[in-house]
A protein has these predicted regions:
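Solvent-exposed loop/turn segments flanking beta-strands in beta-repeat/beta-sandwich domains
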Residues: 25-67, 157-186
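An aromatic-rich alpha-helical recognition segment common to small helix-rich domains
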Residues: 24, 108-110, 156
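Structural beta-strand segments of beta-rich domains
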Residues: 18-22, 150-154
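Beta-strand-rich modules
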Residues: 100-118
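Extracellular fibronectin type III
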Residues: 1, 115-133
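Surface-exposed, short loops/turns at beta-strand junctions within beta-sandwich domains
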Residues: 71-72, 82-84, 89, 95-105, ...
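Residue-level recognition of beta-strand termini and adjacent short loop/turns
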Residues: 14-16, 146-148
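Proline-enriched interdomain boundary motifs that mark the N-terminal boundary
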Residues: 3-11, 134-142
């Protein structure tokens, strides 16, 4: 129902086209919780992957199981690496969410969970929308200087000081995304930080 019933107060801040920070304060200071931000598309994937049947918590359990298998721990022991207590500020923790798709819905997922893996609050989702890019009349002329294996050098001559991105990819990697129309989404989800 109502925001007053939510177990956490979640506020987004420093929202840009591709980044955001957030502050989470549990209404019960004794609750250990996990918070994760992702795009709405990814959230929907997490809810519906495998046998999750709409339960995003199962995505986290699957992740913790995989990590536990790698490090010789149970999935419940893995929770401590993600768990928070008290007020959490992603900016203060140097954990700004980056590489988000611009002008798109993002979700801050927050839930209380015990060290034994028992869900103790409803899963709270807080929607935030990243900003739309500001159109630019910047004219960019690219010149290929070096075209060698793992050594591609390009110079860019620009007509103004507006920010821009140059991202060199092999045709083999990019062609499928160009054809499917999701090139920008693929580039942003590649792990490259475009916040500056």
């Amino acid at each position: 129902g109502k925001t007053a019933d939510d177990p956490f107060v979640v506020n987004a801040k420093n929202v840009t086209t591709t980044t955001l920070d957030y502050v989470v304060t549990p209404k019960d200071d004794n609750v250990q919780y996990v918070v994760q931000t992702t795009g709405m598309d990814m959230y929907n994937t997490w809810c519906n992957e495998g046998e999750n049947n709409g339960d995003v918590f199962q995505h986290f359990v699957t992740f913790w199981k995989a990590m536990g298998n790698m490090y010789g721990e149970t999935w419940q022991q893995q929770i401590k690496y993600d768990a928070k207590k008290g007020t959490y500020d992603s900016e203060v923790d140097y954990n700004t969410q980056k590489t988000l798709l611009w002008d798109a819905d993002q979700v801050i997922i927050t839930f209380g969970v015990t060290k034994d893996g028992e869900l103790v609050t409803p899963i709270q989702t807080t929607k935030v929308r990243t900003l739309a890019p500001v159109p630019s009349d910047n004219k960019i002329k690219l010149t290929l200087k070096t075209n060698a294996w793992r050594n591609v050098v390009i110079t860019a001559d620009v007509s103004n000081s507006d920010k821009y991105i140059v991202n060199v990819q092999s045709a083999a990697a990019a062609d499928a995304h160009i054809q499917s129309g999701d090139l920008v989404k693929w580039l942003l989800n590649s792990g490259t930080d475009y916040s500056n």
